[in-house]
Amino acid sequence: MRNISIIGAGQAGLQLGIGLLNAGYHVSLYSRYSAKEILNGSILSSPSMFNDSLECERKLNLNYWDTVCPKNKTVTYTLSQSNKTEIALRWQGNTIHPYQAIDQRLKFSCWIEEFIQLGGQLIIQDVHIKDLSYIARQQELTIVTSGKGEISQLFPINETRTIFDKPQRVLCCLYVKDMLSVAYSQGVRANVIPGIGEYFITPGLTLTGTCEMML
């Protein structure tokens, strides 16, 4: 078996595709967007990657940003008193190894270019369930790594692992520069305000340099 298709050009699909190319396989990668479209698109998330995940990237020489990305070392949790501005509880933990938060537009666009340079075939297509049979017939193995869009319906919720059947939050994400530093924290800060919501701040790296990722 030497010819493989991967559907989804995200964290899993790109690493798998590049790893398979390095091992001598012929790989076709299906992506809804090109590298340029991803780079110029909207924020995808506020991702924190911890050491085990970062080591997987390093083994594939995909750790392009190790020297420029903030090295986060703590996780701080703060709970406010209900209907008040005073702090009710705060605790902080230290990680054994630094962790990173890199804008996925930067990461995925660079990884797609690396995939192409290694000889991979990038196919720009929004794959639907009806397309899978045709794609599977063209290759010896087809792997789905996408969890978004129609194709996610292939994977029903595992009710033994979750009691929820819909999102529990309405999310807003933005990146800001030149935010005032906080002396007590060198990493993500999770703030809970009862009755209002949650607010996460993570030092990270975006297209224009270091930033604070707010969720």
At which residue positions do the language-model features occur?
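Glycine-rich FAD pyrophosphate-binding loop
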Residues: 5-9, 18-42
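N-terminal Rossmann-fold NAD(P) dinucleotide-binding loop
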Residues: 13-14
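Short, glycine/charged-enriched secondary-structure capping and boundary segments
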Residues: 20, 43-44, 156-160
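Residue-level detector of anion-binding/catalytic polar loops
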Residues: 26-27, 63, 121, 141
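N-terminal FAD cofactor-binding segment of flavoenzymes
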Residues: 37-82
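Charged, glycine/proline-rich intrinsically disordered loops and linkers
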Residues: 71-73, 78-95, 183-191
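Well-ordered mid-protein domain cores that form the structural environment of catalytic cofactors
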Residues: 94-115
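Predominantly flavin-linked oxidoreductase catalytic cores and closely associated redox partners
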Residues: 110-215
